[in-house]
Amino acid sequence: MEALNSILTGYAVAALSVYALWFYFLSRRLTGPKVLPFVGSLPYLIANRSRIHDWIADNLRATGGTYQTCTMVIPFVAKAQGFYTVTCHPKNVEHILKTRFDNYPKGPMWRAAFHDLLGQGIFNSDGDTWLMQRKTAALEFTTRTLRQAMARWVNGTIKNRLWLILDRAVQNNKPVDLQDLFLRLTFDNICGLTFGKDPETLSLDLPDNPFSVAFDTATEATLKRLLYTGFLWRIQKAMGIGSEDKLKKSLEVVETYMNDAIDARKNSPSDDLLSRFLKKRDVNGNVLPTDVLQRIALNFVLAGRDTSSVALSWFFWLVMNNREVETKIVNELSMVLKETRGNDQEKWTEEPLEFDEADRLVYLKAALAETLRLYPSVPQDFKYVVDDDVLPDGTFVPRGSTVTYSIYSIGRMKTIWGEDCLEFRPERWLTADGERFETPKDGYKFVAFNAGPRTCLGKDLAYNQMKSVASAVLLRYRVFPVPGHRVEQKMSLTLFMKNGLRVYLQPRGEVLA
């Protein structure tokens, strides 16, 4: 028995010695945060979870814009599933999103995690499946009828609901959570635009709509899959426990709601996206089945709700802390409305801005772009590495590993945006005369709307929606943060405010000085 114990002890010592040597050489190659045996940099990531994006930015500053780390320091695993290359170098981002686009798909882990919610929809697919939907959607997003439909939904929601809620808050001197209101507004709008059915979550009593609640639950449960190993969430799914049980039940509600919407549009087509996809055929000439239509619609709902509402929330937070920017926005609004509606300021707030009026708001667009530079709605994205590759800065990325590009960090690098990169300065987006909006010459230093073949199709609609909502609030009210309210980032794929954005409102009164 002692001999057996001695042999086992010898094997264990030898294995640990080999592991220690392997770990030594691996850790010397890793340029990012410190890694520990077996668990890698995971403890430091967890310790910094409340400021995860700033922590990543700190590491990128210290390493010149790119670093590599492991979250599973185990032989034969560390070079693939647990290996991450993190970058904010614009040339690397261009390489990933454009030059070697096919080498950096969503990847199997991402597709598996989101499959139950998004199926093979445009935001959860690669290759030919993605390309077919992209081409179809691209045609629809260039039509004027879609722009008109969006304007109708946005302005109707502002006039008939948002203004009523804000007016009541002013009368009662009660605070409101702008983030919650914007989430409800954009959810109602994107549902109306996508399948012509308004869930009316933005109403005076701020109701809990079953579809909205189920959609939120399904989204949160799906995001948890990315925090677990595939094995763990699949076990939960098979056993029907934990977040997987919530996901299953919420998806049943979502699918019932979507089936009703699809049936309604089959019987009465309109100008929404679902009606347009109902006319499409697959590669074999067959109509798209109901489950495919469900997932196509849900993909657009997911993309169109959170991004604009989160951007608007951070916009108002920045404006409240930079009153000189607010003054310039209101002055620009007054100049445009004086030309389009005359000198009577009461007429300026009778109706929300038309999209044609919003198109003329150059400074407001610059302020929104500056918001997205500092607080991008999607702060980082992940890509799977199909084949070994070398990034433009010389970093080798092994196949099977993950590449993360930090959009949040790009906007906070002095080497990219200059010494004033942390300042909220909309003027950086304008031509020297201040007359025109100007995108950066290096397009990959601003990828808040993605870039390359996956550039956001709804970018222009998103800007117009945000300009309409921002102007609707700023023309009528002055906004002040609730004393003591803490604005913090939530650890999520979308840059939500953890505690919302609670504010008081005051009537603006005369706009012109």
From Swiss-Prot:
Keyword annotations of the record: Heme, Iron, Membrane, Metal-binding, Monooxygenase, NADP, Oxidoreductase, Transmembrane, Transmembrane helix
Transmembrane segments: 7-27
GO-annotated cellular components: membrane; plant-type vacuole
Membrane topology summary: Single-pass membrane protein
Compartments in which it is found: Membrane
Principal cellular location given in the protein's record: membrane
Tissue distribution: Expressed in roots.
A GO term, aspect molecular function: iron ion binding
Cofactor: heme
Keyword Metal-binding: yes
Expression triggers: By abscisic acid (ABA), the ethylene precursor ACC, mannitol or cold treatment. Down-regulated by auxin and salicylic acid (SA).
Substrates-to-products reaction catalysed: an omega-methyl-long-chain fatty acid + reduced [NADPH--hemoprotein reductase] + O2 = an omega-hydroxy-long-chain fatty acid + oxidized [NADPH--hemoprotein reductase] + H2O + H(+)
Family matches, as SUPFAM superfamilies: Cytochrome P450 (SSF48264)
Purpose: Catalyzes the omega-hydroxylation of various fatty acids (FA). Acts on saturated and unsaturated fatty acids with chain lengths from C12 to C18 but not on hexadecane.
Protein name, as recorded: Cytochrome P450 86A1
Encoding gene per record: CYP86A1
